């Protein structure tokens, strides 16, 4: 028993020693985290995520959370008897659906995350992209055509980022708050738009020249056709994986924003397994991490590897 206790103490000491260099390296750095997937619905994972964010802030980092909430939106729509329609993974969003999206993302989900952070000793403020003109949006122009018809589908209030104004984020960081952001923007037409949370997180990370962009997923990272974790890719291989269908569906916007981010000022993007407790801390503060890391080398060639950058 004493031997086991000694081993446990040694392991804890090793982890803390390993983490120290990362605490020092990333002190004062901005980390944008896209929060979604199982980590948002499992109670234990929700708690561990909030603790991770508070610890990051406590050691001098500046975490910024951008969250999704698709399943929660779907549940409320079902309760009011409104059926959801998806085209290529995007929810067709009419005016009534957009009202629900704003209530769920800007209210229910956002404030739950803020409350969890507060429960674990952090100080957080929740907002949508409409607050402080944070996210200027534009309607997503879709050329999606359903099978067997040439009709072009109007996705309604589905948007994309037009511009990011980081003024309100900087005010919150200066006040030592953790920003928690719902991916809703407003267009020049005055309408609200629901935007893919991965793309919002990437746009905010680029605007802030963030040290890292972290995307939580329901997989162990970027996988090959055999389900094995990919840890050494360049941009050409990524393109071929998209072409042959290995990367598809919900992973496509993650890859798009990962590549765009590291091309536009973000030091590294991490696609990690949100099903693992304390995944964010393990990715940032340990040598091996829990996912796939995408970064640029000095020559500007994109590479992907599973080590801390």
Swiss-Prot record:
Pathway listed: Amino-acid biosynthesis; L-arginine biosynthesis; N(2)-acetyl-L-ornithine from L-glutamate: step 2/4
A GO molecular-function annotation: acetylglutamate kinase activity
Keyword Kinase: yes
The organism of origin for this protein: Vesicomyosocius okutanii subsp. Calyptogena okutanii (strain HA)
Protein name per its UniProtKB record: Acetylglutamate kinase
Chief localization: cytoplasm
Reactions accelerated catalytically: N-acetyl-L-glutamate + ATP = N-acetyl-L-glutamyl 5-phosphate + ADP
Location in or out of the cell: Cytoplasm
Biological processes annotated in GO: arginine biosynthetic process via ornithine; L-arginine biosynthetic process
Name of the gene: argB
EC numbers, comma separated: 2.7.2.8
UniProt entry keywords in alphabetical sequence: Amino-acid biosynthesis, Arginine biosynthesis, ATP-binding, Cytoplasm, Kinase, Nucleotide-binding, Transferase
Chain positions recorded as substrate binding sites: 69-70, 91, 194
Site, Transition state stabilizer: residue positions: 34, 254
Entry similarity comment: Belongs to the acetylglutamate kinase family. ArgB subfamily.
Gene Ontology CC annotation, any one: cytoplasm
Function: Catalyzes the ATP-dependent phosphorylation of N-acetyl-L-glutamate.
């Amino acid at each position: 028993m004493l031997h086991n206790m000694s081993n446990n103490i040694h392991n804890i000491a090793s982890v803390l020693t390993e983490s120290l260099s990362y605490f020092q390296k990333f002190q004062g750095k901005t980390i944008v985290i896209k929060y979604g997937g199982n980590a948002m619905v499992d109670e234990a994972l929700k708690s561990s995520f909030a603790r991770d964010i508070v610890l990051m802030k406590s050691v001098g980092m500046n975490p910024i959370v951008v969250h999704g909430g698709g399943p929660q939106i779907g549940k409320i729509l079902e309760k009011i008897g409104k059926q959801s329609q998806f085209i290529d993974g995007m929810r067709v969003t009419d005016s009534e659906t957009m009202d629900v999206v704003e209530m769920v993302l800007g209210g229910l989900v956002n404030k739950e995350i803020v409350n969890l952070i507060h429960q674990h000793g952090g100080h957080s403020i929740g907002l949508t992209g409409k607050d402080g003109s944070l996210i200027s949006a534009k309607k997503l122009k879709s050329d999606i055509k359903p099978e067997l018809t040439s009709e072009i589908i109007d996705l309604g209030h589905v948007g994309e980022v037009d511009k990011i104004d980081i003024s309100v984020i900087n005010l919150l960081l200066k006040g030592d708050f953790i920003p928690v952001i719902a991916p809703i923007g407003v267009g020049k037409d005055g309408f609200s738009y629901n935007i893919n949370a991965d793309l919002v997180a990437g746009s905010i990370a680029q605007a802030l020249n963030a040290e890292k962009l972290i995307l939580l997923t329901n997989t162990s990272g970027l996988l090959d056709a055999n389900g094995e974790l990919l840890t050494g890719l360049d941009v050409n291989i990524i393109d071929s994986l998209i072409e042959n269908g290995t990367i598809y569906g919900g992973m496509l916007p993650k890859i798009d924003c990962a590549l765009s981010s590291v091309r536009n000022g973000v030091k590294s993007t991490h696609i990690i397994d949100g099903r693992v407790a304390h995944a964010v801390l393990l990715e940032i503060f340990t040598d091996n991490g829990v996912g796939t890391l995408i970064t640029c080398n000095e020559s500007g060639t994109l590479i992907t590897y599973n080590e801390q950058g």
